[in-house]
Design a protein with these regions (language model features):
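Acidic/His/Gly-enriched intrinsically disordered linker/tail segments
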Residues: 143-146, 185, 314-315, 337, ...
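Central hydrophobic cores of alpha-helical transmembrane segments
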Residues: 135-149, 215-223, 439
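Beta/coil-rich, acidic/histidine-enriched accessory regions frequently appended to metallopeptidases
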Residues: 153-162, 167-175, 179-180, 219-231, ...
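Selective transmembrane-helix segments that form parts of the transport pathway or gating/packing helices
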Residues: 61, 68-93, 467-469
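Cytosolic-side transmembrane helix boundary signature
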Residues: 188-220
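Juxtacatalytic substrate-recognition/specificity segment
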Residues: 39-40, 244-362, 373, 380-381, ...
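Long, hydrophobic alpha-helical segments
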Residues: 21-60
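Membrane-interfacial interhelical loops
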Residues: 30-40, 85-108, 140-188
Length: 730
């Protein structure tokens, strides 16, 4: 093959310049890329690495023995234009068409994008020195190899985050909105700069050397690159199986699982329960999927979201890697997420491709099966949540949902619930074997002998006939959020909110007030509004907090955050001696009934208003232990079941206190309505945590006397099944 000589095309730099201009004009019309931010900088780092490398080869072909600095001087004007175009377009887009702050974008651009252009030049020059033919092809192969190294790390390593010479850093999922310039990113970029600077000197050194010398240095460069890849885990730029096990520090082996968990998790009874829950869910999922394998699942349990972010990459998302037979969950959410992630892992036995999932990598199929087998959304079967959405007018087109990556076009709970409910319908009506076949081949006609339209019509007829009381406020609570693509300045807001929260936790309320106010002015997020109001209250600016919140709360009507804000506003009214306004708001919240937890909190406040308004004002500032004692005192004469879940929530970090609370209510619980049933359900869960399995069973049995809610009754039955299984195991 004869190399295509781009050096003879004098307009080549103009072509690249035009391409950069055109691509950036397209980028600013794409969600998450339309402002000067992290994603915009990453996209342009890839573009400028490629452009600067190609330009270097084009120029070097005309001046074959030119030094690195000579090449830089000859193309410096083009390079300035290359780097300026994205900078100018991104900056103008942010300044004239957005209210987002540009500071973060500037920092990312100079730490991620500008170095990438330099690395492209060095790579292009080094290739010109080492190779005499096929330079463009070799550069493109090198570019793709460097760019897609993270695919290998993602596949083989227990991690989601990536450090890469071209795009710097990627956190792994879209669910973590906060991405900031960390010390790790800066140190990684400095090492990149050192390496590519040395490579530039090596290129100059090799200009007049013989072929054998060049080959030796090429080998040395490749060896150094390999060494760096191997030591990345020690530098915290990647995570391997062994490094993750070492960092977590503890392990537990059960019949069906090998669990590696954080050494910060100390409670032996909770660790024991964690192991039993792994085996119970394993057997449940295996039976429903009709699987025969007895292979052990490897589970990594992180102490909290922050540890998960540091070691694994994703703080918010719990993840399974079916092809590795591994699950990654934080301790605070494992009871909710474990069964779901276990479905992903066990489904690998009938999955397709190297990733052991759906053939087309369709997230609606992958998550739909997991939701259907888990069949628990906020302690209700998944059909319940789907019906709540359906009756409230929150609907999806299944044909669209199961096409490509449209799963991510909706707020996440909408996609998860509908995909899960639809799969649950398919399992119940067509059998698990046909669903497993579809999971593998993604062909409705082959698996079910019907197309998606016919199956969708069947499913929605089924859903419409379910007898569930319509509750639009519950629908808003469940489904009233926004995807990251529809939020205003999500990256900047998340990063600044984290800083503001740090000020708040350190007691610097003046600074937190200023920063939360700034964030709310451009992003109008719930987190910034809540933080601002709480900061104002800490500064005793209660009237200002009331005025601001009563005006701004209207903007959140219809969102999942509205009910939290109603509670907060009622508290502000109470502090400002506006009892009538507070009671009116609490009555409204009870009537809306978005969730029993909100109703419980409203009833607690109404009871305390009747008893002692001044004590209630003090209650808001009490420590957890004092709140527990005060609420327990209120239960001495009569049991107020609406207080029990909150008492248990306050007690969860103190096992001794939790045990005393459980024992106090042990002989007093009488289930006669939903409030007492829900309290009993929470008490049975708490008894499990402290290792009192007999008491857990007593509470669970009592809850079954409440049968007015057939969907919640299924949850109560499942709760008792698990507790019986634990007791039998003991």
């Amino acid at each position: 093959l004869k190399e295509f000589k781009l050096k003879n095309i004098n307009s080549f730099p103009s072509i690249i310049t035009t391409a950069i201009l055109f691509i950036n004009l397209l980028l600013i019309n794409i969600p998450l890329l339309k402002t000067f931010n992290y994603e915009y900088s990453v996209a342009n780092s890839i573009l400028l690495f490629l452009a600067s490398g190609l330009l270097t080869i084009w120029k070097n072909n005309s001046y074959n023995n030119a030094s690195f600095l000579q090449v830089i001087k000859s193309i410096k004007n083009y390079l300035i234009v290359f780097c300026f175009i994205p900078f100018a377009i991104g900056l103008m887009s942010s300044l004239f068409f957005s209210i987002c702050p540009v500071w973060n974008g500037l920092v990312f651009y100079f730490i991620i994008t500008i170095p990438a252009a330099f690395f492209g030049i060095v790579t292009g020059k080094f290739i010109c020195v080492i190779f005499e033919k096929f330079r463009y092809l070799i550069f493109l192969i090198s570019f793709l190899f460097i760019l897609f190294i993270p695919v290998a790390e993602f596949y083989f390593n227990p991690q989601l985050f990536f450090f890469n010479p071209i795009f710097g850093y990627f956190s792994g999922t879209i669910y973590d909105e906060e991405i900031s310039v960390s010390f790790l990113l800066i140190s990684y970029r400095l090492l990149n700069i050192i390496f590519f600077t040395l490579l530039a000197f090596v290129s100059d050194f090799l200009l007049t050397k013989k072929r054998i010398t060049k080959n030796i240095f090429l080998f040395i460069v490749l060896v150094f690159t390999l060494i760096f890849v191997l030591i990345k885990p020690a530098l915290h730029y990647s995570t391997t199986y062994s490094s993750l096990i070492k960092n977590l520090g503890k392990s537990l082996t059960t019949e069906h699982s090998v669990i590696f968990y954080s050494n910060k998790i100390k409670d032996e009874k909770q660790i024991k329960l964690m192991g039993m829950m792994h085996d119970y869910f394993y057997e449940q999922v295996k039976d429903e999927l009709k699987q025969k394998s007895n292979r052990k699942i490897i589970s990594f349990i992180f102490f909290d979201e922050e540890e998960k972010r540091k070691l694994f990459g994703s703080a918010k998302a719990n993840v399974s890697k079916p092809w590795l037979n591994q699950i990654y969950i934080d301790f605070n959410s494992y009871t909710r997420a474990l069964k779901h992630e276990m479905v992903h892992t066990l489904a690998s036995e009938f999955g397709a491709t190297l990733f052991k999932i759906n053939k087309n990598f369709n997230p609606s199929v992958v998550e739909g099966l997991a939701m259907a087998i888990e069949n628990n959304f906020d302690d209700y079967p998944v059909h319940y949540a789907a019906k709540i959405a359906y009756d409230s007018g929150i609907r999806v087109q299944l044909k669209k949902l199961f096409n490509g990556i449209n799963f991510f076009s909706n707020y996440s709970t909408i996609s998860y619930v509908y995909a899960g409910s639809f799969f649950r319908y398919l399992i119940d009506n067509y059998g698990i074997e046909k669903v497993k076949q579809f999971y593998k081949n993604s062909d409705f006609n082959t698996s079910f002998k019907k197309n998606i339209d016919d199956l969708g019509n069947e499913y929605f007829r089924f859903l419409s006939k379910l007898n569930i009381k319509k509750n639009p406020d519950k629908a808003k609570l469940y489904f009233g959020g926004k995807t990251i693509f529809k939020k205003i300045c999500p990256r900047s807001a998340a990063e600044e909110t984290k800083r503001a929260m740090n000020y708040y936790k350190k007691g610097n309320f003046s600074q937190s007030e200023k920063l939360f106010s700034k964030i709310y002015n451009y992003a109008e997020t719930y987190e910034s509004l809540s933080g601002l109001i709480n900061s104002l209250m800490k500064l005793n600016k209660n009237l200002e907090a009331e005025k601001f919140l009563s005006r701004e709360i209207k903007k959140f009507k219809g969102s999942s955050y509205f009910y939290n804000l109603e509670l907060t506003l009622s508290d502000v009214y109470l502090i400002n001696h506006k009892i009538e306004s507070a009671e009116k708001l609490l009555d409204s919240l009870i009537a809306q009934n978005p969730h029993i937890e909100y109703v419980n909190h409203a009833l607690i406040r109404k009871m305390m208003i009747r008893n002692d308004v001044e004590k209630l004002k003090v209650f808001f500032r009490m420590k957890s232990i004092d709140k527990i004692n005060y609420l327990m005192d209120l239960n001495q004469k009569d049991i107020h079941y609406f207080t029990v879940p909150y008492i248990l929530e306050l007690s969860k970090t103190d096992n001794a206190k939790l045990k005393s609370v459980v024992n106090y209510f042990k002989d007093k619980l009488k289930v006669n309505d939903f409030f007492s049933c829900y309290a009993g359900f929470k008490l049975s869960n708490a008894a499990l945590v402290i290792g009192d399995y007999n008491t857990a069973k007593e509470f669970a049995v009592k809850t079954l006397s409440y049968k007015d809610d057939e969907f919640f009754y299924k949850t109560l039955v499942n709760n008792l099944k698990f507790i019986n299984w634990v007791n039998n195991l003991e």
